């Protein structure tokens, strides 16, 4: 007897429907074909134990299972459930009349309980696209899978629940969650606020400009000056996620297994802050079973690299291409996947190894050679891709104790959203362009062309600071954002002047340190 069940194979963010063909004949052997990895091949032992522990006997017959299409690699333990149901149906224990209506995914515990799988959301999207009536997933994955409309999604606790449902002996209702309502309710709830930070108004302004235009930013200052504190509050002034952005972000986190049981759609922009010991693979993605890295988990959000020069230079250099292309292609001998990675890079660093170069309250103990080697850890090409360089100084306690609370994030966010709306209107006819940081060279001439006085100022800065052509483009993009925040249609000299001021690492004694 031949029985077919349906499941899915996840490759990057792409999902392929997989047909599990189960055939039984005389004999006692078990055959599994279809480019299955080790975890899938081990499913026989899990299925056998689960069946026995739930009152079933493993058929004493020759079982042949083919996972079609056979040229797509099948990875992970999510095939346990469709394989088990296929074996039971071929043995007459499960009615096969409904098997073509549902997609099944789930890992089996030895006691028959269903364990969560990765990629439930993109699998649900695929099931709807293939016009399946419903999707059966482990209960732990129900909230993310139920995000998809026009698809009946059932969360099951055990193998027996699935058997009773397919046989019609027990009635289950599909899970319906008002995910959109939850999404909008949770968008504006932040634990951290800019009003917590006293002083540092110039840095807050730089962060506001960065948020308004989607610009990359680096903060340079001594220990304890508030670099990390300010960076962690950046998401509170970023514009809210759209539903489309949230869906894409949630899919990436779903594939990576980062979605908790209580989460449906990710409602706030991601903030990822990996440790400086991170490897290349962990940062950009990859591995034997390809997984998204930190740059993809930060998609539509912020990637914060604290103490940036402490990261190995080889790790930092892999950021250059993703920062330009806003996507990462990972190619290995056995696979090739692509993940989106449109993120804001926010970095912090000390001015020298001891941290106190230029600090009026501490003496720097570093030699010029040590300072130069420290600064050279960040290459010029990478630094060119960072639009805003912001110097930060520690606030003296005498001033700190007398200052009033700063401007709240909600007020700053209103200005950022207003600037982003101007940019959305400007770029509405350009596919994939949402903010000023994404502008091409051609678009700069159209939307950020400075007047004669501004061009003279910019030419002088280029010559004196020895700026690259890429730095020139970054200045124009930042100036366009500053003009948007001011509600100005044209880029004026005051906007250019402020943008040039955000090239701290290209100026004066900074440049002499070796960058």
Task: Give the residues covered by each predicted segment.
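Peripheral, non-AAA+ core regions of ATP-driven protein-machinery
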Residues: 1-218, 222-228, 331, 471-472, ...
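Basic, amphipathic alpha-helical bundle interface domains used for macromolecular binding and assembly
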Residues: 33, 39-44, 59, 66-76, ...
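Residues immediately C-terminal
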Residues: 110, 303-304, 310-311
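Conserved alpha-helical scaffold flanking the Walker A/P-loop in AAA+ ATPase domains
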Residues: 208, 265, 270, 280-303, ...
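Walker A/P-loop
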Residues: 219-260
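The Walker A (P-loop) glycine that initiates the GxxxxGKT/S ATP-binding motif of P-loop NTPases
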Residues: 221, 285, 307
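Walker B catalytic acidic pair
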Residues: 300, 306-307, 318
